[in-house]
Amino acid sequence: MKRLFELDVLRGVLLLMMVVDHSSSSLRLFTDQPFGFFTTAECFVFVSAFLAGLLFSKRAEERGFAAARSASIHRAGRICLGHLVTLGFAFALGGLFLSEFPGIRNLLDHYLRNQWAAIGGAVVLAFRPPLMDILPMYILFSFLTPAAFAAARQWGWKIVLLFSASIWFVAQIHVRDLLITAFEGVSFIQLGPFDLFAWQLLWISGLFLGQRFYKGKTLLPLPVLHPLLLLCTVAFLVWRWSSIVFGSDLVAQTWLLDKWHLGPLRLVNFFAAAFVAARLLKYLNRWETLLRPLSLIGRHMLPVFCRPDLLHTGSHWPCRVGLDQRTDDLCLSTLPTGNGATFSIVPGIRSTTEAFRPWRPRVRARSLGN
């Protein structure tokens, strides 16, 4: 199956936006929930699940379910290894050289208190420091993907979706918070803010739509609902920017739009916007050459994804020695964004150069012949 250029571009854009979101740059105004009450995290999880569902279905049809299951687990293992290498570098950098800086102490507080316990917790994905908490969620969901497809084979996708929605519903009463309270003070457990009981609904939905896409089935709802979804997307967009321009919005701060537990209105906003985006993505092929660097960033997302996390960890310290407060604030706001964006874009440019390299000798030979 041919790679989906549109999704590669989308993942590249999401990665660059995520770099800015994890910085203190003023550009966050335009990258942090710019299209409504959802962030790049929801998009990243959903798009990744969509591709996982598509690829699992393709492998299962061509090589059998066992081969698809093995490939899915193998990929999850590779991503887990990349995450652990990234985390290990952050531990070494922060623990050996930068532990006296407040920013590093905030990021790696549990690790600095009990290093061996934190390392053990990281291996089993129970220790997830800030800025490095979304990949463990992705890894866990990837390991569970074969189980979701096995359940769908046995009982059908309706049952799987209903079960997933039920878990999400239970998550709205903050069951996870009770578990965190029970393990409070345990040095090797730092689960991060994401409620996996809620976020699994995005993953299961992405798997479901990915396998439908592979089978050529319709992904969009009934045509009669299309105007309603568009109107819903515009309404949330206006609401979001109104809350930014005119100040605090009390409703936006309630559980209905909660990010970590995926409040119901937040889900409605995301899926409505996803419908609109799906209708627009097909037009990206018209600018394939122009958007090629972004598509290559998205195609090589795993190695690129790990680099901004390392840079954000390191950029908490360089400007904190011997500078006045104004210069200090300027450095802290620009370093993460500049470093992260640079190390995200460079692989795309390098890959683009490699893509055009095979044509160079041919052009040169023709010139010599003339």
What are these regions (language model features)?
Residues 1-370:
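Alpha-helical transmembrane segments and their immediate juxtamembrane cytosolic regions
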